Design a protein with these regions (language model features):
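Gram-negative bacterial Sec-dependent N-terminal signal peptides
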Residues: 1-21
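Outer-membrane beta-barrel "beta-signal"
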Residues: 354-356, 388-402
Length: 402
């Protein structure tokens, strides 16, 4: 009741007609953790460990308002506005967008649900079946810097349709308008897929693609992915994921395979040197071509010479008691670079979650990332790449949801 009253006050402050809603609720989550990460690049060949207070590692910190109105005849109007933030600094998330996590309005009924606005696509639902569901942001970087979208990316200017539940199956399709005058395809995004849940079995399959444009309908990590090369309307990202999980008593075993294709990045490369882990600091006067190639973002996921990547994700969630779960997972990512050897990343994660109550939980995670023939994406929250072929991070945190 207190939440509903507070939500009405918030909406009134924005001048909204809160009184028209059948129900309005404020909700959110706050996730803070202490972290230590070793072998972070501090310049040149130097490295150092980092102690930090992180936000949203396992569950993105957020504050949202949602409402539903019964229109009669089995039809309901609904809306959600959700803001992301960093609890360690108080800064807004999603590059400062006010309702960066979600802003939608729509209708639901026997026909399914239609939502319009800024929202995630079905690959977020598919990803939640495996490691992203257990570890959250812990595994987003090894998942091709989340270019496979399994840890949640948003689509601006979008309309999404979700089917009713048919004996455990729910389908979804999303379309993002590029809003480019004279070129409908520029900046356009499209995705579809579905999930199936029946007893101990859970399966998901999703596909998403985005096109280059002055405005990109989709949030895409990696500046090179949909920026430069080709022309407006050219497809710059294609990705799909297949995931499955099965509950064996107290143990949930899961796995997924993701593939990302970046058609435009390869088109921009005319020369590709062999990978050299010391090229970035071998010649500070930039007298060698390798240094120039590194500066342009080669040998990184979504970089100038990265044309595709694929990720295998395997894990187990073992429930020891109603309050305690042990979680573990492994990710193997292989990145294909133009006219040179493939890069590889392997990340191992071990952790535990303990529920103090229905709304409050604690967690501890240790993870190790190893790379070869490419630059490390790093484990640190501020995204400073690891400077070594092996990097370890430790986190202990607290989550409160309301």
């Amino acid at each position: 009741m207190k939440k509903s009253i507070l939500a009405l006050a918030v909406l009134a402050a924005f001048g909204g007609a809160a009184h028209a809603q059948s129900s309005v609720t404020i909700y959110g989550a706050v996730d803070a953790s202490l972290s230590y990460t070793n072998k972070i690049s501090t310049g040149g060949k130097d490295t150092g460990g980092q102690m930090a207070l992180d936000s949203g590692l396992m569950k993105g910190s957020r504050l949202g308002v949602k409402g539903v109105e019964d229109l009669g005849g089995g039809i309901k109007a609904l809306f959600t506005i959700e803001n992301g933030f960093s609890v360690d600094t108080g800064e807004a998330g999603q590059k400062g967008v006010l309702w960066g996590r979600q802003a939608t309005v729509g209708l639901s009924g026997n026909f399914g649900t239609v939502l319009a606005g800024r929202q995630k696509d079905v690959l977020d639902d598919v990803g939640s079946i495996t490691s992203p569901g257990d570890f959250g942001g812990v595994v987003s970087r090894v998942h091709s810097l989340n270019l496979d979208r399994t840890n949640g990316e948003r689509v601006n200017n979008s309309i999404r349709y979700n089917t009713p539940n048919f004996n455990g199956f729910t389908g979804s399709v999303i379309y993002g308008f590029g809003e480019q005058a004279g070129n409908t395809g520029a900046g356009q995004s499209f995705g579809l897929g579905g999930t199936y849940a029946n007893g101990p079995l859970n399966i998901g399959l999703g596909y998403f693609q985005s096109k280059m444009g002055g405005k990109s309908a989709s949030d895409v990590n990696g500046a090179a992915a949909c920026n430069g090369g080709g022309k407006y309307g050219d497809t710059c990202l294609k990705t799909w994921t297949l995931a499955a999980a099965y509950q064996f008593g107290p143990a949930r075993v899961y796995g997924s395979y993701s593939r990302v294709k970046l058609p435009l990045t390869a088109a921009r490369r005319s020369f590709d040197p062999k990978f050299d882990s010391f090229a970035a600091w071998t010649d500070p006067n930039k007298k060698i071509e390798r240094y120039d190639a590194v500066e342009k973002g080669d040998y990184t996921i979504g970089g100038a010479n990265n044309e595709s990547s694929q990720t295998l994700d395997l894990g187990v969630n073992y429930r020891i008691s109603p309050s305690l779960a042990l979680i573990s997972s492994l990710q193997y990512t292989r990145a294909k670079f133009v006219r040179t050897s493939d890069g590889r990343m392997v990340q191992i994660n071990l952790g535990a979650k303990y529920d103090l109550s229905k709304r409050t939980s604690t967690y501890a995670v240790i993870r190790n990332l190893r790379t070869s023939d490419m630059y490390s994406v790093g484990l640190a929250s501020d995204r400073v790449p690891g400077s070594d072929r092996s990097q370890t991070g430790i986190n202990a945190g607290l989550i409160h949801s309301f």
